[in-house]
């Protein structure tokens, strides 16, 4: 699963949230029930489920018949307990005989006439109806959005399948499935497995029959139905389905252009062919996540559809989410975590294979840069540091999503570094084949790798997976000219407490002198260690952990001359990026600015050019400004780099000559994203005519409303209360949802005494649109009005919020109380 709004590192200019909000967004949990960190004990095995669903669109109700085949797992099984929430059970048979049953708030309990023996099989048929609050969602036209295509879709992870099917709803069991979906004749449906047929019914509806012949965990069952447009293709004889809401079909080709290449890459590198009967990718409206890896049938948010007009401006498009969800078809679906505490076995692998796709398709530098950026982001999320990846003390599998995703991906990166490519991919092949169709825990992964490579990994898994944190190094060196020797002192400075200890890690040290370079492997395992290396002269450059092989922070003070040499000459992207960032701490040094200017113009990799521009924006001064202007106007530069350059211009608030230059970029640049960045920077520098420029830009039409949204965002940053009426108007129901998001966040910053703004934001809390519900919470928190505390508390008490939304609401209440000093 991809969490909502995760984006790769070239997209800073497209995000309409502050760094604080972004860190919270990246921690946003799935909309599931409270997770059980230990796998359940079971007294039966669910072997097959056949579900027929009918839908009442007007009432947003479902009617279902579930035929579930089970086998007892022990003797004397007197009753069967199915997970079921909010469903009215209308009738039930066991082996064809009507049977009494009882229900609780969370379960359907079925007593057996005679206690079952181990291996004894029974067939349970359940007739039911309900109006699901979770799990299954109706997206329908209403008075605000009358053109909205009709859609129904499900989201089972973590434990929400129980809201539309009475079923065993925990990942440590697998079942084959069949879904029969009776829908309007013009609709398309997607579900797991093979389409067995479509039958016309007497009432004018059609029933689609989907059959999943290989077992899956029930949270991976999927139903999608609605007014969709489908493009069909095939890969090695396997049907491919590309499905989008009607009206979005012009985005199909630009959004799915790499699917076949991804299938080739993953199948061949893992030496495990894609394992399912089809691969469908369906984009749906108002999805509660970025993407979900339902077996053979991924569901994705329409937010990730790639507008063909903007495709050339976006480095990877929707590749990151599509590669993530496709990787899950092996890691998460073919082999599935047994319990939620081991969810990193799903998400860490999918995150890693996002990077692997980028490495193979866009180049190793791209992948290295993304890992470097995510490392810094992970360390900024302080709450993650003291918690291990496998954490059985949490009842929410994604409370610490940054560990499951980001750190999980980094662990696999480090494992590949340690094992080498041949052993790493051999081990993954062995892991998948040995555990094919099984539910696993971390010990199964470790065992498979050890058996495939004859490598003991106890220490690796102990410190990186079962314990918390990562090493934080303080490094220094001295050069002894007489002895021709370098002494390197390494201290681990992380606070050793709880599950955070000292780390034992291999480190590559590279030393460059005028006569050449040489690398030395060392092992750091103590609180303080020193190492000596021969050197025929004072070093031009000393690299600690060349290439960023280890998840860590490093404080390593070096002279400007050394850092400039590293920026120009280090072989790897992370080492050059580290040098650029370190140079940002040096003020009033013309040589530093000149070196960063050279990097911004001439470095071979776009990410280093971007980092140099960011650092120049931080340093400031006329020379830095001229360098940034040069990058912004360089028509041969990549649009996402020019976007970053234009963002930096917003930091030069004292230069009145910038206003017309930014206005020209906003009006004339060939890239929409660069024009959008210019509008935001016009607001940041508070240009004399900024208000009029931004109001005029709100009226502009552009693909996906890129310019309007940037102008709305800019009006919030400008801080001119004249914009309140305009922004409130654009936040109203009926406006484009992305524009509403921008308007809500923007107006939250204006006229703090205006209670009408707070009332408007509060009124959006109960709208039936996830995109609105999510962002208005942050707008309310940013506004800081204590009048919102009671409505937020009422929302919590209502029970109408998911576990993920609950954590966000609680964050905003705490933020508001902190500002008022209340408890």
What are these regions, as identified by a protein language model?
Residues 210, 242-490:
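Hydrophobic alpha-helical and helix-loop surface patches within well-folded domains
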Residues 571-572, 604-605, 636-638, 670-671, ...:
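Short inter-helical turns and helix N-cap capping residues of alpha-solenoid HEAT/ARM repeat scaffolds
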């Amino acid at each position: 699963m991809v969490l909502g709004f995760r984006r790769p590192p070239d997209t800073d200019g497209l995000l309409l949230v502050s760094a604080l909000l972004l860190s919270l967004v990246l921690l946003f949990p799935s909309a599931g029930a409270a997770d059980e960190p230990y796998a359940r004990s079971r007294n039966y095995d669910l072997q097959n489920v056949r579900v027929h669903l009918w839908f009442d669109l007007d009432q947003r109700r479902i009617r279902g018949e579930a035929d579930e085949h089970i086998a007892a797992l022990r003797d004397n099984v007197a009753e069967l307990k199915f997970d079921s929430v909010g469903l009215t059970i209308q009738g039930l048979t066991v082996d064809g005989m009507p049977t009494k049953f009882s229900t609780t708030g969370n379960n359907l309990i079925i007593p057996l006439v005679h206690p079952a023996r181990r291996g004894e099989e029974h067939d349970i048929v359940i007739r039911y109806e309900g109006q699901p609050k979770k799990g299954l969602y109706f997206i329908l036209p209403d008075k605000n959005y009358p053109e909205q295509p009709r859609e129904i879709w499900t989201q089972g992870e973590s434990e929400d399948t129980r809201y539309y099917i009475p079923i065993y709803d925990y990942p440590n069991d697998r079942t084959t499935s069949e879904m029969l979906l009776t829908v309007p004749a013009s609709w398309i449906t997607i579900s797991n497995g093979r389409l067995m047929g479509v039958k016309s019914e007497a009432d004018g509806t059609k029933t689609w029959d989907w059959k999943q012949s290989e077992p899956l965990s029930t949270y991976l069952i999927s139903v999608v139905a609605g007014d969709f447009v489908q493009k069909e293709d095939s890969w090695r004889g396997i049907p491919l389905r590309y499905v989008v809401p009607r009206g979005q079909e012009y985005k199909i080709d630009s959004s799915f252009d790499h699917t076949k290449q991804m299938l080739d890459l993953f199948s061949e590198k893992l030496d495990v062919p894609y394992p399912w009967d089809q691969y469908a990718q369906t984009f749906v409206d108002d999805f509660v996540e970025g993407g979900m890896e339902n077996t053979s049938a991924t569901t994705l948010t329409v937010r990730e559809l790639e507008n063909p007009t903007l495709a050339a401006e976006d480095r990877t498009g929707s590749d990151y989410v599509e590669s993530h969800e496709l990787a899950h078809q092996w890691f998460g679906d073919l082999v599935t975590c047994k319990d939620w505490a081991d969810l990193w076995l799903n998400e860490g692998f999918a995150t890693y294979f996002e990077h692997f796709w980028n490495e193979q398709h866009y180049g190793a530098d791209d992948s290295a840069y993304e890992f470097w950026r995510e490392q810094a982001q992970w360390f900024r999320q302080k709450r993650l540091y003291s918690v291990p990846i496998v954490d059985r003390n949490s009842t929410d599998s994604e409370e610490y999503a940054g560990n499951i995703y980001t750190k999980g991906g980094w662990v696999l990166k480090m494992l590949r570094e340690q094992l080498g490519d041949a052993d790493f991919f051999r081990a993954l092949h062995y892991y998948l084949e040995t555990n094919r169709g099984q539910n696993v825990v971390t010990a199964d992964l470790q065992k498979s790798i050890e058996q495939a490579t004859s490598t003991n990994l106890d220490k690796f898994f102990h410190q990186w997976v079962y314990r918390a944190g990562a090493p934080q190094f303080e490094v220094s060196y001295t050069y002894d000219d007489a002895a021709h020797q370098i002494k390197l002192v390494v201290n681990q400075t992380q606070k050793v407490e709880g599950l955070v200890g000292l780390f034992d890690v291999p480190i590559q040290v590279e030393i460059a002198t005028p006569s050449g370079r040489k690398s030395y492997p060392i092992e750091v395992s103590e609180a303080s260690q020193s190492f000596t290396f021969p050197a025929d002269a004072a070093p031009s450059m000393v690299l600690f952990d060349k290439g960023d092989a280890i998840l860590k922070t490093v404080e390593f003070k070096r002279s400007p001359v050394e850092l400039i040499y590293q920026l120009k000459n280090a072989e790897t992207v992370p080492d050059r990026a580290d040098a650029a960032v370190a140079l940002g701490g040096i003020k009033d040094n013309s040589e530093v600015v000149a070196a960063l200017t050279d990097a911004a113009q001439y470095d071979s990799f776009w990410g280093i050019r971007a980092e140099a521009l960011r650092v120049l924006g931080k340093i400031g001064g006329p020379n830095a400004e001229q360098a940034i202007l040069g990058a912004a106007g360089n028509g041969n530069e990549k649009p996402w780099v020019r976007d970053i350059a234009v963002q930096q211009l917003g930091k030069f608030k004292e230069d009145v000559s910038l206003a017309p230059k930014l206005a020209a970029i906003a009006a004339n640049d060939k890239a929409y994203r660069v024009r959008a960045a210019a509008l935001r920077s016009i607001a940041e520098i508070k240009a004399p005519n900024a208000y009029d420029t931004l109001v005029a830009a709100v009226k502009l039409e552009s693909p996906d409303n890129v310019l309007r949204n940037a102008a709305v965002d800019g009006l919030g940053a400008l801080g001119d209360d004249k914009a309140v009426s305009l922004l409130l108007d654009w936040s109203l129901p009926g406006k484009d949802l992305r524009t509403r998001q921008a308007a809500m966040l923007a107006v939250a910053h204006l006229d703090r005494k205006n209670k009408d703004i707070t009332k408007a934001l509060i009124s959006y809390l109960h709208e039936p649109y996830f995109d609105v519900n999510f962002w208005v919470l942050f707008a309310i928190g940013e506004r800081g009005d204590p009048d919102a505390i009671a409505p937020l508390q009422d929302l919590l008490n209502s029970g109408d919020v998911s576990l993920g939304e609950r954590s966000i609401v609680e964050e905003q209440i705490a933020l508001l109380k902190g500002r008022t000093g209340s408890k």
